[in-house]
Amino acid sequence: MGRPIVAIIGRPNVGKSTLVNRLCGSREAIVDDQPGVTRDRTYQDAFWADREFKVVDTGGLVFDDESEFLPEIRQQAKLALSEASVALIVVDGQEGVTTADKEIASWLRHCECPTLVAVNKCESPEQGLAMAADFWSLGLGEPYPVSAIHGSGTGELLDQVILLLPSKESSEEEDEPIQLAIIGRPNVGKSSLLNSICGETRAIVSSIRGTTRDTIDTLLKREQQAWKLIDTAGIRRRRSVSYGPEYFGINRSLKAIERSDVCLLVIDALDGVTEQDQRLAGRIEQEGKACLVVVNKWDAVEKDTYTMPLMEKELRSKLYFLDWADMLFTSALTGQRVQLIFNLASLAVEQHRRRVSTSVVNEVLSEALTWRSPPTTRGGRQGRLYYGTQVSTQPPSFSLFVNEPKLFGDSYRRYIERQLREGLGFEGTPLKLFWRGKQQRAAQKDLARQKENLSK
């Protein structure tokens, strides 16, 4: 779908993720000295010679070991190859040809897409040619010496990649997808939920905490709408995380919240809302993101007619700052209600981008003032709310012009927000209210006059 894909394949610790970052001009792929840091397949955008394409990084392939994750990593690499236009096997020039390299090369010969050999860690151009020559023995064509760290040789490698990509006409860009980030603590079922949504094993699933170490982007289309689903590393308290792959993965997860259009906050139905869930909810609200709360593992809960409403009431009491978010009880294991996620997420995004006319805003405010007047101080000073207007979207933000902001306490401010929600909707998105006093209004008018004078 959309741009062509280049799959990066190789054994552990040959520098695949470093090369991905070099080819894409970013630092999104997690790089660490220990082998096996990358487990799932992760996508990044790349651009070269007036061509846009995607690079998919895969976990290190090992064929003589069936221990935890390794069969799943091979399956992820196989899925990456099935959608790729070009396969790029990365080898270590300093180590030379290994048995594992030969096994991977033999495996790639059954791949339908063309294959290139990138001989990494060739920091010296002269020695690099000699190192690369040994890899002709893999039988995959000319080996290209590169240094992922320094960037040498990557231009020539990208030139060859571009030659093998399908023509522009056959890979036209589609509309920008809605970015949906799947956020939650470790082991709440985020990757299982992603796989259930996609109908394929898109992310490795295990009962071991921290299986997903990086953010994983998946593109799919539903009812003519393109979506980018971002599965993230489970986020624990920072003091519980040592410096390394998990630390970087958590940072990527927090950045995924920033770049998302809507967040799915996944809660474990068996655990309920924990302190860390509350922190994540607060981060989503702080970033001003649309949100849907997904209560996963609903199949494992013993229930009767009253279980769901009672549990929702309990969960909402602990997630009170997300009281505007819809809550959906699902089971990634059985698929129960999983497909409803798209409907509710679409509604949340629509409301997040929605704009309301000033006249409609003030109709709602006028009715709110009729039902409950602004507070009065002990000295007899009463707050006055003159008018309001929407100033931005994503999230919907309103400026409320008053005589003096400090006269309006938290209770009355919450009341006005509730009235705006009841009168205008805005399900699934936070609202931002800015209370502007007389001095602020005067300063804004002066600034507007100055701009008008400068334009004359």
From Swiss-Prot:
UniProt GO molecular function: GTP binding; ribosome binding
Organism, scientific name: Prochlorococcus marinus (strain MIT 9211)
Domain KH-like per the UniProt entry, residue ranges: 354-439
Keywords linked to the UniProt accession: GTP-binding, Nucleotide-binding, Repeat, Ribosome biogenesis
Protein task: GTPase that plays an essential role in the late steps of ribosome biogenesis.
Residues holding GTP 1: 10-17, 57-61, 120-123
Gene: der
Gene3D superfamilies: 3.30.300.20, P-loop containing nucleotide triphosphate hydrolases
Subunit structure: Associates with the 50S ribosomal subunit.
UniProt protein name: GTPase Der
Top-level taxon of origin: Bacteria
GO BP annotation list: ribosome biogenesis
Signal peptide extent: none
